[in-house]
């Protein structure tokens, strides 16, 4: 049994009692990376020398019994800036970018005395559902190396599933925490929009992006969200909501819980094995005293189209800053200022990023704004209202995290429409801004299936309670890939 088979709480107790040291944990992390990284490719940049130094310092100082995360190794998605540690967003255009400040979540993790093992691979600028659009390399699913880990936080999920780190941070714009968590058999939380500061997150779509934790189990996830939540003056969209002790909500008692199951989430396009795993999970929750009814989120069908217009429009604006002038890659082949802009961007961005910038620029252009962007915003309002209406009568909404299990590497990369439509069960949650968690709920043909539990605004505590109660009745989260 390795050290990472223990939970956050168990490792904390061992550290306080000096049965193990932070140096032991960091060493275990790098030993595991050495053993499996060539197979999975979770990381872009490792932080070995610094991590070992921090671990020694923490060990010498002793672990504060009140600091649950002190001395524990974490991986951070490479679109979250880290001072003096290369941050690339998995793009050639930021290949050598060395930030001069930490993202707010990174500062909070440093205050919590976690130890950053390195920066995790992702789809370029978080645009993708498979971690195949990274400029550096593809990441492989630890459960089946011929398959994708999901995306865009594929490295964050694969590193946890492969035991390279204890937990990680990802970001979720349209499912980028929940879908990889489902594909890799781990737990991923997308918090309510505004719960976690976005300061220092390299922007994709600012009205949709949210940082969240990926962990082996629900309790660890709750501890990590406690550490990174809270109002931040540097982020005007962060909300002044008290930081709850989410870990206190893990009581196991869900008697009387009212669950809504959208008929749109278990209909056409959902793999039979995925559907069966979700229905079995609902039976487990019924045994625990919950009840469920079929409900409708009638505007879900507009989710993917609305999302790709709105997210691409915001991306076309956000990514205009990468022009070869201030930072990042600069084309050596330019002779005029206009050439500098065009060549830097055409050489520095990958195909998927360029596709979305062009789509967004088109949607915002004169004559098309009303037909596309404005209509997508109107559809977004209707999608949000669907959730508001269901939550009047139900406590949570439940469905699959993804309509399929992990697909083959190169299986969809040349078919963007099919890839986009695979996000159908996650993008409505981002459009509405509500929280959702993915927890392992079974297997289909040997591949993990994720159960998505969706809550009302700022009801992460309830999501943790339900997810934890389910987890305690099952063993799916204890299953490990055979690497």
Curated annotation (Swiss-Prot):
PROSITE patterns reported for this sequence: AMIDASES
Organism superkingdom: Bacteria
EC number: 6.3.5.7
Gene Ontology CC: one annotated term: glutamyl-tRNA(Gln) amidotransferase complex
Pfam families reported in the protein's UniProt record: Amidase
Gene3D superfamilies the UniProt entry points to: Amidase signature (AS) domain
First-level EC class: ligase
Active site residues of this protein: 77 (charge relay system), 152 (charge relay system), 176 (acyl-ester intermediate)
UniProt entry keywords in alphabetical sequence: ATP-binding, Ligase, Nucleotide-binding, Protein biosynthesis
Coiled coil feature spans: none
Gene Ontology terms for molecular function: ATP binding; glutaminyl-tRNA synthase (glutamine-hydrolyzing) activity
Catalysed reactions, as listed in the record: L-glutamyl-tRNA(Gln) + L-glutamine + ATP + H2O = L-glutaminyl-tRNA(Gln) + L-glutamate + ADP + phosphate + H(+)
Function statement: Allows the formation of correctly charged Gln-tRNA(Gln) through the transamidation of misacylated Glu-tRNA(Gln) in organisms which lack glutaminyl-tRNA synthetase. The reaction takes place in the presence of glutamine and ATP through an activated gamma-phospho-Glu-tRNA(Gln).
Protein name: Glutamyl-tRNA(Gln) amidotransferase subunit A
Known partners and oligomeric status: Heterotrimer of A, B and C subunits.
Family affiliation: Belongs to the amidase family. GatA subfamily.
GO biological process, one term: translation
HAMAP family named in the record: GatA
Source organism phylogeny: Bacteria, Bacillati, Bacillota, Bacilli, Bacillales
Organism expressing this protein natively: Listeria innocua serovar 6a (strain ATCC BAA-680 / CLIP 11262)
């Amino acid at each position: 049994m390795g050290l990472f088979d223990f939970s956050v709480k168990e490792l904390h107790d061992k550290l306080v009692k000096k049965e193990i040291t932070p140096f032991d944990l960091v060493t275990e992390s790098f030993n595991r990376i050495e053993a499996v990284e060539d197979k999975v490719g979770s990381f872009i940049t490792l932080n070995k020398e610094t991590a070992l130094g921090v671990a020694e310092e923490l060990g010498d100082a002793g672990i504060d019994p009140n600091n649950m995360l002190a001395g524990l190794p974490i991986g951070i998605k490479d679109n979250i800036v880290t001072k003096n540690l290369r941050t690339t967003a998995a793009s050639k255009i930021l290949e050598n970018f060395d930030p001069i400040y930490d993202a707010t979540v990174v500062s909070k993790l440093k205050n919590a005395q976690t130890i950053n093992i390195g920066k995790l691979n992702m789809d370029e600028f978080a645009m993708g559902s498979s971690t195949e659009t990274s400029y550096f390399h593809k990441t492989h699913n630890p459960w089946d190396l011929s398959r994708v880990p999901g995306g865009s936080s594929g490295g964050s999920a694969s590193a946890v599933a492969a035991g390279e780190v204890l937990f990680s941070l990802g970001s979720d714009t349209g499912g980028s925490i929940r879908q990889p968590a489902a594909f890799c058999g781990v737990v991923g939380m997308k918090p309510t929009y505004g719960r976690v500061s976005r300061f220092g997150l390299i922007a994709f779509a600012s009205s949709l992006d949210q940082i969240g934790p990926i962990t082996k189990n629900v309790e660890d996830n709750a501890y990590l969200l406690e550490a990174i939540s809270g109002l931040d003056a540097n982020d005007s969209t962060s909300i002044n909501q008290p930081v709850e002790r989410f870990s206190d909500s893990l009581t196991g008692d869900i008697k009387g819980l009212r669950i809504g199951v959208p008929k749109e989430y278990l209909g056409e396009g959902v793999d039979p094995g995925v559907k069966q795993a979700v229905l079995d999970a609902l039976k487990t929750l019924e045994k625990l005293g919950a009840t469920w009814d079929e409900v409708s989120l009638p505007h879900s069908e507009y989710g993917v189209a609305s999302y790709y217009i709105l997210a691409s429009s915001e991306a076309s604006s956000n990514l205009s800053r990468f022009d070869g002038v201030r930072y990042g890659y600069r084309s050596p082949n330019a002779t005029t200022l206009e050439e500098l802009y065009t060549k830097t961007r055409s050489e520095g961005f990958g195909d998927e990023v360029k596709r979305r910038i062009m789509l967004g620029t088109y949607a915002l252009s004169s004559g098309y704004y009303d037909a596309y962007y404005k209509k997508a915003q109107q559809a977004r309002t209707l999608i949000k209202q669907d959730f508001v209406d269901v939550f009047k009568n139900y406590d949570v909404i439940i469905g699959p995290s993804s309509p399929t299990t992990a697909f083959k590497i190169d299986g969809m990369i040349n078919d963007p429409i099919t890839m986009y439509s695979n996000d159908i069960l996650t993008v409505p949650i981002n459009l509405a801004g509500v929280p959702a968690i993915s927890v392992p709920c079974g297997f289909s043909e040997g591949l993990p299936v994720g159960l998505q539990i969706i809550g009302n605004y700022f009801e992460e505590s309830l999501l943790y309670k339900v997810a934890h109660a389910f987890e305690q009745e099952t063993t799916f989260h204890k299953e490990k890939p055979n690497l």
